[in-house]
Regions:
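Polybasic/polar functional segments that serve as interface/processing modules
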Residues: 1-118
């Protein structure tokens, strides 16, 4: 479910490590106070534990919060380590993250800008 989550308009990740003992209220408070974002929007907020093998997702669905939790059996997420930062992800970056890849792919094809016909 979390690998192909399409219900949200935006996806944000809390960079660095989050204490995953926090529940809905603690994570929603973190979104509001630390990142100055509104947890009551159609946005998926992702948090990663210290071992990088589990993540929690917080999502508001019209009448209540959904708390998603995923623990990898093998491997780890390529999670950005910079503390106290939140990043917005493109749909492609979200897929890369869920597939175990870094969100910045140096070898990925970049969109072409400034097109002209020769």
């Amino acid at each position: 479910m979390l690998n192909d989550f399409t219900g949200a308009d935006k996806v944000y990740i809390a960079c660095g490590y989050t204490d995953l003992r926090k529940g809905i209220d603690g994570l929603a408070r973190m979104v509001q106070q630390q990142f100055q974002l509104d947890p009551f929007t159609n946005t998926l907020f992702l948090f990663c534990g210290r071992r990088r093998d589990r993540i929690k997702g917080l999502y508001w669905e019209r009448d209540g919060f959904i708390l998603l939790y995923k623990r990898l059996v093998q491997g780890a997420y390529q999670w950005p380590r910079s503390e106290s930062e939140v990043r917005s992800l493109t749909p492609q970056q979200y897929r890369w993250l869920m597939e175990g890849l870094k969100i910045e792919q140096p070898k990925a094809h970049r969109p072409v800008t400034g097109l002209t016909v020769l």
